[in-house]
């Protein structure tokens, strides 16, 4: 369920703070959101794929931790990011 390199590069270019930035929380959250969306579509077709379901829950937890970190560090960037990605705010 990995993203292809073209889609990954597009996401990195869109959310990067500067050229070559792949480690900022915004980029990581955007990449996780794309992977979560792909896994969600996969699980709609293959309802009994429990190992993928566990992987999805792990990714959601990781994204949740990164969102919490970004919310505490830089709230304006956090609020822009959740609007752009369509993620609900708690």
UniProtKB/Swiss-Prot annotation:
Keywords for the protein's UniProt record, in alphabetical order: Ribonucleoprotein, Ribosomal protein, RNA-binding, rRNA-binding
Subunit structure: Part of the 30S ribosomal subunit. Forms a bridge to the 50S subunit in the 70S ribosome, contacting the 23S rRNA.
Pfam family, one: Ribosomal_S15
One cellular component (GO) term of this entry: cytosolic small ribosomal subunit
SMART domains cross-referenced by the UniProt entry: Ribosomal_S15 (SM01387)
Disulfide bonds: none
GO MF annotation terms: rRNA binding; structural constituent of ribosome
Protein name as it appears in the record: Small ribosomal subunit protein uS15
Gene Ontology biological-process annotations: translation
Gene3D superfamilies: 6.10.250.3130, S15/NS1, RNA-binding
Sequence similarity: Belongs to the universal ribosomal protein uS15 family.
Function: One of the primary rRNA binding proteins, it binds directly to 16S rRNA where it helps nucleate assembly of the platform of the 30S subunit by binding and bridging several RNA helices of the 16S rRNA. Forms an intersubunit bridge (bridge B4) with the 23S rRNA of the 50S subunit in the ribosome.
């Amino acid at each position: 369920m990995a993203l292809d390199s073209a889609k990954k590069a597009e996401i990195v270019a869109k959310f990067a703070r500067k050229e070559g930035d792949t480690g900022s929380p915004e980029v990581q959250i955007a990449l996780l959101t794309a992977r979560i969306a792909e896994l969600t579509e996969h699980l709609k077709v293959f309802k009994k794929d429990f190992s993928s379901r566990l992987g999805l829950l792990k990714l959601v937890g990781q994204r949740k931790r990164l969102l919490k970190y970004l919310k505490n560090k830089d709230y304006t960037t956090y609020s822009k990011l959740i609007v752009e990605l369509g993620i609900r705010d708690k």
